[in-house]
Amino acid sequence: MAPSTPLLTVRGSEGLYMVNGPPHFTESTVLPRESGRNCKVYTFSKDGTLFAWSNGEKVNIINVANKGLLHSFDLPKAVCLEFSPNNTVLATWQPYTTSKDGTAGTPNLQLYDMKTGACLKSFIQKKMQNWCPSWSDDEIICARNVNNEVHFFENNNFNTIANKLHLQKVNDFNLSPGTQPYKVAVYVPGSKGAPSFVRLYQYPNFAGPQAALANKSFFKADKVTMLWNKKATAVLVIASTEVDKTGASYYGEQTLHYIATNGESAVVQLPKNGPIYDVVWNSSSTEFCAVYGFMPAKATVFNLKCDPVFDFGTGPRNAAFYSPHGHILVLAGFGNLRGQMEVWDVKNYKLISKPVASDSTYFAWCPDGEHILTATCAPRLRVNNGYKIWHYTGSLLHKYDVPSNGELWQVSWQPFLDGIFPAKTIKYQAVPSEVPSEEPKVATAYRPPALRNKPVTNSKLHEEEPPQNMKPHPGSDKPLSKTALKNQRKHEAKKAAKQEARSDAAPTPVPQSAPRNTVTQSASGDPEVDKKIKNLKKKLKAIEQLKEQAAAGKQLEKNQLEKIQKETALLQELEDLELGV
């Protein structure tokens, strides 16, 4: 029988230990405290029944229910651990090393049988990135990326490769959640003028030009993040470039793409320019939330047609977290932001609370869907380390501060399978707490002596937008429907066009002091130059259409790709002509 709340595991300079969840927060006897700084890594199994950790000498595995030691492996350098979904296999990874004479190193990725303790297979895995094999939820298939192709194993038989997915230089892949039919998303970066692409396949149908379930191509991508929804019906792809050629952002440029297993794909249109900070699926698999745009960032919920469902307006935020049941959404600003959180009821789109977890670097929902963990961990921040447990209504239930000379490296909840904790009715009143709530200190702006005796003017650097259903609509208490909003915009556009036509028909007289060589936007005065400008604009429009076709997945001809490569030169030529250079 599951405990009332999951355990908390804490790893830091004080050692490795477990804490009972709310309401007690006492140290648990499940794991005797491992003192010292030698613990490098720990992990729970997916259902929370097994716990493994490395203490710098051995990797130990215990049964959480009876506290019994199951296995102990002599792996002093292990820094990564992960259980397979059904607790059949433990994967361990150690840094890859070669001998001094230059001979190849020994295999550093081990797969252990949890029943017998025997090593099923060892592989050489040089990179820590994507080190762990990916299993389907029923463990029927398991996949690894080996030398730019994906190898598939069946029924945990790692001595025989059951299938291979070979494309030109597969950079990354993502196995779908759930059981049969199994699907896999693969990413191939672009090269030699060809676009990057993400393709979806159904295992084991990889052969032939029509084998892919869906395909999405894009030019602006140095790396991608692929996110399956829970029902494995669609993937969200965040495509990122390392450098933003427009100079708008230091952190490169991001675009968000939607790809469904039925072949549909789309570019998700984000109303505000700027970085994409976070994208998360709701557990219902019918909608997703994106946090994006230059600060203050916007947050919007989209449906499967990529249409916006609800706009949360703007605010100091860079992360989004749905509760395990999908009925609550937390929008937060962590890292270099102050730690403000907004807790929303996403069924009614109603704000529940706005707690502040200052200096937080970590956030996690408790599997019960009621409690929240925030923490300040090293090495991200080496001062004021500690963790806090909140109720989603905004009450701070527990707080632990690490001593000033100590550090907190990791803290997390014990996981549980879906359905163990039923969804409860949402409360809006803050639950009682014995921990006093911390009022964040508001930093006052510097005021020069001459202004100190005068009233403070309330001015903001940015005007924050309210959520969509809070925007005032004249003559109506309810927000306008999508159709009504569209008609209103059309009417406003017509009105603006009429006013523009009138102003063109009756231009205002130019003052005598105005310079005579002012160039109008429509003409340069030289018919030959105007003709060149018109032709250049025509070519640029054709290039834009080709780019849209490529983004939609169409295979372009060689001469069409060459046209796209000429875009920069054409833009420069157009700019020179318009400036009269």
From Swiss-Prot:
<feature type="modified residue" description="Phosphoserine">
    <location>
        <position position="513"/>
    </location>
</feature>
<keyword id="KW-0597">Phosphoprotein</keyword>
<feature type="modified residue" description="Phosphoserine">
    <location>
        <position position="503"/>
    </location>
</feature>
<dbReference type="GO" id="GO:1990928">
    <property type="term" value="P:response to amino acid starvation"/>
</dbReference>
<dbReference type="InterPro" id="IPR015943">
    <property type="entry name" value="WD40/YVTN_repeat-like_dom_sf"/>
</dbReference>
<keyword id="KW-0396">Initiation factor</keyword>
<feature type="modified residue" description="N-acetylalanine; in Eukaryotic translation initiation factor 2A, N-terminally processed">
    <location>
        <position position="2"/>
    </location>
</feature>
<dbReference type="GO" id="GO:0006412">
    <property type="term" value="P:translation"/>
</dbReference>
<feature type="modified residue" description="Phosphothreonine">
    <location>
        <position position="5"/>
    </location>
</feature>
<dbReference type="GO" id="GO:0005850">
    <property type="term" value="C:eukaryotic translation initiation factor 2 complex"/>
</dbReference>
<feature type="repeat" description="WD 2">
    <location>
        <begin position="125"/>
        <end position="163"/>
    </location>
</feature>
<comment type="similarity">
    <text>Belongs to the WD repeat EIF2A family.</text>
</comment>
<dbReference type="Pfam" id="PF08662">
    <property type="entry name" value="eIF2A"/>
</dbReference>
<feature type="compositionally biased region" description="Basic and acidic residues">
    <location>
        <begin position="494"/>
        <end position="503"/>
    </location>
</feature>
<keyword id="KW-0853">WD repeat</keyword>
<feature type="region of interest" description="Disordered">
    <location>
        <begin position="432"/>
        <end position="533"/>
    </location>
</feature>
<dbReference type="GO" id="GO:0017148">
    <property type="term" value="P:negative regulation of translation"/>
</dbReference>
<keyword id="KW-0810">Translation regulation</keyword>
<dbReference type="GO" id="GO:0042255">
    <property type="term" value="P:ribosome assembly"/>
</dbReference>
<dbReference type="InterPro" id="IPR036322">
    <property type="entry name" value="WD40_repeat_dom_sf"/>
</dbReference>
<feature type="modified residue" description="Phosphoserine">
    <location>
        <position position="522"/>
    </location>
</feature>
<dbReference type="GO" id="GO:1904294">
    <property type="term" value="P:positive regulation of ERAD pathway"/>
</dbReference>
<keyword id="KW-0648">Protein biosynthesis</keyword>
<dbReference type="GO" id="GO:0030968">
    <property type="term" value="P:endoplasmic reticulum unfolded protein response"/>
</dbReference>
<feature type="compositionally biased region" description="Polar residues">
    <location>
        <begin position="514"/>
        <end position="524"/>
    </location>
</feature>
<feature type="modified residue" description="N-acetylmethionine">
    <location>
        <position position="1"/>
    </location>
</feature>
<dbReference type="GO" id="GO:0032933">
    <property type="term" value="P:SREBP signaling pathway"/>
</dbReference>
<comment type="function">
    <text>Functions in the early steps of protein synthesis of a small number of specific mRNAs. Acts by directing the binding of methionyl-tRNAi to 40S ribosomal subunits. In contrast to the eIF-2 complex, it binds methionyl-tRNAi to 40S subunits in a codon-dependent manner, whereas the eIF-2 complex binds methionyl-tRNAi to 40S subunits in a GTP-dependent manner.</text>
</comment>
<protein>
    <recommendedName>
        <fullName>Eukaryotic translation initiation factor 2A</fullName>
    </recommendedName>
</protein>
<keyword id="KW-0007">Acetylation</keyword>
<feature type="repeat" description="WD 3">
    <location>
        <begin position="356"/>
        <end position="401"/>
    </location>
</feature>
<keyword id="KW-0175">Coiled coil</keyword>
<dbReference type="GO" id="GO:0006417">
    <property type="term" value="P:regulation of translation"/>
</dbReference>
<dbReference type="GO" id="GO:0005737">
    <property type="term" value="C:cytoplasm"/>
</dbReference>
<dbReference type="InterPro" id="IPR011387">
    <property type="entry name" value="TIF2A"/>
</dbReference>
<dbReference type="GO" id="GO:0009967">
    <property type="term" value="P:positive regulation of signal transduction"/>
</dbReference>
<dbReference type="GO" id="GO:0003743">
    <property type="term" value="F:translation initiation factor activity"/>
</dbReference>
<keyword id="KW-0677">Repeat</keyword>
<dbReference type="InterPro" id="IPR013979">
    <property type="entry name" value="TIF_beta_prop-like"/>
</dbReference>
<dbReference type="GO" id="GO:0000049">
    <property type="term" value="F:tRNA binding"/>
</dbReference>
<feature type="coiled-coil region">
    <location>
        <begin position="527"/>
        <end position="578"/>
    </location>
</feature>
<dbReference type="GO" id="GO:0043022">
    <property type="term" value="F:ribosome binding"/>
</dbReference>
